[in-house]
């Protein structure tokens, strides 16, 4: 089964659950993620993906290491997560999703919370 088909199945499994963005901060704390020194967060109604990709390209061209998360994907789930302008590999995507899903099995999270 392709990663996209597998993740589409996961979306259906979790689609009944309510989205609560406040939970995300607690999830990040539980994962003990140490954020990089600088983070750029882009908000608003229109143009977030284009702006994020433009900034990402400028930073990369100036020798910065970059990570980019955008949502929703246009074609494949892999395009949501980029490291130095390259989409995350299928194997990595599935590995990390399963790891997070297992860690938070008792949390009753929706797909967005698990994937973000």
Regions found by a protein language model. Give the residues of each.
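ATP-dependent carboxylate-amine ligase catalytic core
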Residues: 21, 28, 32-35, 61-116
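Short active-site-proximal "capping" loops at secondary-structure junctions
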Residues: 46-48, 73-74
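Short functional linear segments
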Residues: 1-44, 51-53, 57-62, 69, ...
